[in-house]
């Protein structure tokens, strides 16, 4: 038995198996955000959760036997599985939390750069197919008319902001994967793509956050430059130290803002209008539901796929309030700790771009609901993954 487990470890089979499972999981989830009509086999989701769960549990047993876990990793792995399982079991709509929990735990010691690579390849391939198919008339290109933004195209996805979110997360994943090897040409290409996507779909939050991310990349390059003022690198370090807790800071900020919101106050109304009535819609949902320890089924209207849905739209767009209301305040607390721990590990590994990306993602999730969605955010897998610290030459060699 001992020899078998050590051989699995020696040949890196655990990591290879994880990347195969991850690619399948991301593929299915990204396809579900497009207009491709796929009739999955009955109980396909449960089969997928069983595969991910079986892998994660077997790996945990093996790694405990080989003493590959630190105490905090093992304890927090059980906390994630336990807390995510409760709403997955007791609410009919959230069984996918099984898959998310086991994906996070199963990423133990898998190179995070390999995770990013798999995510980018699968997501980009699906998006390219969706865009081409929508323009060729093979699937629907949903169009939404906005009085301020004109016609917004979904480009084969279920909603324009979903298309924008995919591009945003791909851009962030790319700059983190490239790390210190990111070139000015790549920054220019990402900027151009972001502008084109904005013209086509007008995803304001995703476009703004992409440019903020690129600004941070430029800042990081200047901080590394020989002869750069000490204040530039010092400021980056201070921002990264604070930024490790970005998800918690933005979550607390949104919950406080929602608590103070008054729909009859003209100043709140003007501010809420600028953020697309997110506070008002959440306020309406809070009239019917309260925040619980482990969440509840919430009836929402606004999952995309329908250009006429705006007439009775009622959706939790913000990630933090969505998690608190749907999955429970306990899950939100676990998610906040999970992201803080992952960001801290990235900071300790000198992967400052990942820490800066975490800040931008936390800001993005202030407006969008993708914080713990496998189709969008691979950074939720950071906490237990292997985070390599690469110099410029080492990164170039790896690429």
Ranges and model annotations:
Residues 2-32, 45-66, 71-263, 312-395:
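Hydrophobic transmembrane helix bundles of membrane-integrated enzymes that assemble
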Residues 38-45:
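Internal amphipathic alpha-helical repeat/solenoid segments
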Residues 268-327:
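Long extracytoplasmic/lumenal interhelical loops at the membrane interface
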Residues 397-399:
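Membrane-proximal cytoplasmic C-terminal regulatory module of class A 7TM GPCRs
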């Amino acid at each position: 038995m001992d020899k078998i487990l050590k051989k699995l470890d020696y040949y890196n089979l655990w990591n290879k198996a994880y990347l195969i499972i991850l690619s399948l999981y991301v593929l299915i989830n990204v396809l579900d955000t497009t207009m491709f009509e796929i009739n999955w086999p009955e109980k396909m989701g449960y089969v997928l959760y069983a595969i991910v769960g079986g892998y994660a549990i077997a790996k945990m047993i093996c790694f405990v036997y080989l003493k590959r876990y630190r105490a905090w990793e093992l304890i927090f792995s059980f906390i994630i599985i336990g807390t995510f399982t409760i709403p997955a079991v007791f609410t009919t709509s959230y069984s996918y939390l099984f898959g998310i929990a086991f994906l996070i735990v199963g990423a133990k010691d898998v190179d995070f750069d390999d995770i990013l690579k798999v995510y980018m390849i699968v997501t980009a391939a699906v998006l390219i197919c969706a865009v081409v198919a929508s323009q060729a008339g093979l699937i629907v290109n949903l169009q939404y008319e906005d009085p301020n933004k004109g016609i917004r195209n979904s480009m084969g996805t279920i909603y324009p902001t979903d298309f924008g979110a995919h591009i945003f997360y791909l851009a962030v994943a790319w700059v983190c994967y490239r790390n210190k090897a990111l070139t000015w040409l790549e920054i220019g290409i990402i900027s151009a793509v972001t502008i084109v996507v904005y013209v086509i779909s007008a995803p304001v939050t995703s476009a703004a956050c992409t440019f903020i991310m690129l600004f941070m990349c430029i800042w990081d390059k200047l901080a590394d430059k020989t002869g750069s003022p000490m204040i530039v690198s010092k400021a980056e370090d201070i921002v990264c130290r604070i930024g490790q807790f970005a998800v918690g800071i933005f979550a607390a900020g949104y919950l406080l803002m929602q608590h103070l919101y008054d729909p009859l106050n003209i100043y709140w109304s003007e501010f809420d209008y600028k953020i697309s009535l997110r506070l008002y819609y959440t306020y309406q949902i809070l009239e019917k539901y309260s925040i619980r320890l482990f969440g509840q089924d919430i009836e929402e209207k606004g999952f995309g796929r329908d250009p006429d849905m705006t007439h009775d739209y009622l959706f939790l767009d913000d990630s933090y309030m969505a998690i608190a209301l749907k999955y429970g305040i306990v899950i939100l607390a676990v998610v906040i700790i999970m992201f803080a721990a992952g960001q801290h590990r990235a900071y300790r590994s000198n992967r400052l771009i990942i820490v800066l990306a975490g800040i931008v993602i936390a800001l993005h999730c202030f407006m969008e609901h993708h914080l713990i969605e496998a189709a969008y955010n691979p950074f939720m897998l950071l906490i237990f993954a292997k985070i390599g610290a690469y110099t410029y030459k080492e990164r170039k060699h790896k690429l």
